[in-house]
UniProtKB/Swiss-Prot annotation:
Coiled coil: none
Purpose of the protein: Binds preferentially and cooperatively to pyrimidine rich single-stranded DNA (ss-DNA). Required to maintain the copy number of mitochondrial DNA (mtDNA) and plays crucial roles during mtDNA replication that stimulate activity of the DNA polymerase at the replication fork. May also function in mtDNA repair.
Record-given protein name: Single-stranded DNA-binding protein 1-A, mitochondrial
GO molecular function: chromatin binding; enzyme activator activity; single-stranded DNA binding
Transit peptide: 1-17
Entry-linked Pfam families: SSB
Localization, UniProt: Mitochondrion; Mitochondrion matrix, Mitochondrion nucleoid
Gene that encodes it: ssbp1-a
Keyword DNA-binding found: yes
Paired cysteines (S-S): none
């Protein structure tokens, strides 16, 4: 009865202990960002490659310095804005993002983080961090209704 599951566990253990084979294991690369769009999206297409919609998204971090750590009492409120480059490759989502994402819109973007490298116009190699969007949820708030 337990022979088959035990054998599967042993095989998995043996695969993990082998120095000659590739170890296959699950990992997670998931990002969720809630913020506002910095500029209207652009669509780019390199020769021979699929088009991509690109826009920036700002997220903010707030904290209070001073005597109290709550927002209801004295102390200075500090804010840090981080800008994220969002790239949308999925055909349906890419087109929706290009047509409907607008500067100032509040979005929830789900995707994965990608670290890449490119050569700029001065032939200097640069690092680039991009969020590859798998899903975009359009949110509204009071600013949209004023």
């Amino acid at each position: 009865m337990f022979h088959r599951p035990a054998l599967q566990v042993f095989r998995q253990f043996a695969r993990c202990q082998s120095t000659d084979s590739v170890i296959l294991e699950r990992s997670i690369n998931k990002v969720q960002l809630l913020g506002r769009v910095g500029q209207d999206p652009v669509m780019r297409q390199a020769e021979g490659k699929n088009p991509v919609t690109i826009f920036s998204l700002a997220t903010n971090e707030l904290w209070r310095s001073g005597e109290s750590e709550t927002f209801h009492t004295a102390g200075d409120v500090n804010q840090k804005t981080t800008w994220h480059r969002i790239s949308v490759f999925r055909p349906g989502l890419r087109d929706v993002a290009y047509q409907h994402v607008k500067k100032g819109a509040r979005l929830l973007v789900e995707g994965k983080i990608d670290y890449g490298e490119y050569t700029d116009k001065n032939n200097v190699r640069r690092q680039a961090t991009t969020i590859i969007a798998d899903n975009i949820i359009f949110l509204s708030d009071l600013r949209d209704k004023l």
